[in-house]
Amino acid sequence: MPSRIGIDLDNTILRYDEVFYSLAQAELWIDRNCLCDKDAIKKELTKNAESAEKSEKRWQQLQAWAYGKDISKALVYDGLFNFTKQARLRGDELFIVSHKTEFSNFDPSVNLRRSALDTLGQRGFFKSIIQGGLGFSLQDIFFASSL
């Protein structure tokens, strides 16, 4: 029996570790020997900032960049394309869910949802399977604001 499967966009479909790392490195906010991992980067920001407030502002700035103007640099997790194609062959219904707000409080000039959709389009998510894509439509994408 086919299933209905929702896949979380951020940190399940798209991987941001390298984006956060390169952005934080460019700003000289982390040491070069910091692990390329979001949690490690956040800890490094805390260690290197003059205050907790400064650390949190830097983290929010990184998030605004990574989920907005630099989202196209995020990598698709290994195995996602194969999983999606196999699920479609089984007849499963697939959906993408994101709790991304429309605009970042830190940088309201970039529409985070539009940036995400553009990136998915560039990666072939909206192309048919026959065209080498993943066969999603805009109706398969759900943005749900967090409380």
Name the predicted role of every residue range.
Residues 43-85, 89-92:
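Metal-dependent phosphoesterase signature
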Residues 71, 80-120:
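Substrate-recognition element of Asp-dependent hydrolases with the DxDx(T/V) motif
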Residues 12-14, 19-20, 100-104, 147:
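Short, solvent-exposed loop/turn segments at secondary-structure junctions
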Residues 1-58:
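Active-site neighborhood of HAD-like aspartate-dependent phosphohydrolases
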Residues 7-9, 74, 97-99, 143-145:
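Short His-Asn-centered micro-motif
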Residues 92, 106-147:
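C-terminal cap/substrate-recognition subdomain and adjoining C-terminal extension
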